[in-house]
Regions:
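PLP-dependent amino-acid enzyme catalytic core
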Residues: 1-273
Length: 273
């Protein structure tokens, strides 16, 4: 049963254009980069004795982490509850439920903070609970430092570009490749369609001193670039991939070797096609 976990990570590095390359994370078992942290956080919690048989895993998510955790919880026999804003992609909600996990939606106006607060409330209802707390869990950073960061460490890289999100991807790569310029990506709008890039909270694991620049991308521009990636590169990716590539192309005007990530698949956002 655990064999599928061996296929998480070591994703392909694909060329977008002359100066931009990207890790294709949709090839992970559940279809996104979040498989990496879900696996690592669960395994570390088990190792420390924080997560045991009979426990319920409760996490606030914009979708992808919930899907990844639901997959792993299904394999390991844990009950899973995913809490997410009501504007989360319906496809993602259905995918989480397909793994047998429960989903709870919080008001859009409360943004991601509302989902996090709901997990604390739910934690009081269950006697045996483990909260991954991806926004403050140092295992999130460590996972990308020894995983994604290590995978690209031997490549000549001038800059690494990724959505800020939980901060884990950026911080992990920053620690693995200290000489690389670290560029964060955020949505320009308060209410946007780029899931997983800007969640409306400041992650505790985010160290701003390690970020060299933040680039803001409009939702409509991210969607347009996502469609171009499909039509020009043959890569069916999600909206955050379009945002990351746009930001990487801005950075590539100054630097020759820029690496970014394509976090998930376009199948999760049928409404944009």
């Amino acid at each position: 049963m655990d064999n599928i976990l061996k296929h998480i990570g070591n994703t392909p590095l694909v060329q977008i254009n002359k100066h931009v390359w990207a890790k294709l994370e949709s090839v992970n078992p559940s279809g996104s980069i979040k498989d990496r942290i879900a696996k690592y956080m669960v395994e570390m919690a088990e190792k420390r004795g924080e997560l045991k048989k009979g426990y319920t895993v409760i996490e606030a998510t914009s979708g992808n982490t919930g899907i990844s955790l639901a997959m792993i919880c299904a394999m390991k026999g844990y009950m899973m509850i995913a809490v997410m804003p009501e504007n989360t992609s319906k496809r993602k909600i259905k995918m989480i439920e397909a793994f047998g996990a429960k989903t709870i939606l919080t008001p859009k106006k409360e943004k991601f903070k509302g989902a996090i607060e709901k997990t604390y409330y739910l934690a009081k209802k269950y006697k045996k609970v483990w909260l991954p707390r991806q926004f403050e869990n140092p295992d999130n950073v460590k996972c990308h430092e020894i995983g994604l960061g290590k995978e690209i460490a031997n490549i000549k890289i001038d800059a690494f570009v990724a959505g800020i999100g939980t901060g884990g991807t950026l911080m992990g790569v920053a620690k693995a490749i200290p000489k690389a310029r670290i560029i964060g990506v955020q949505a320009e709008e308060t209410f946007h369609r780029i899931e997983g890039v800007s969640d409306g909270i400041i992650p505790k694991i985010l160290d701003n001193s390690l970020i060299d620049r933040i680039i803001k991308i409009k939702s409509k521009d991210a969607i347009k670039r996502t469609k171009r990636i499909a039509r020009e590169q043959g890569l069916f990716v999600g909206i955050s991939s379009g945002a990351n590539v746009l930001a990487a192309e801005i950075v590539a005007k100054k630097f020759n070797n820029v690496i970014t990530v394509l976090p998930d698949s376009g199948e999760r956002y049928p409404e944009i096609w």
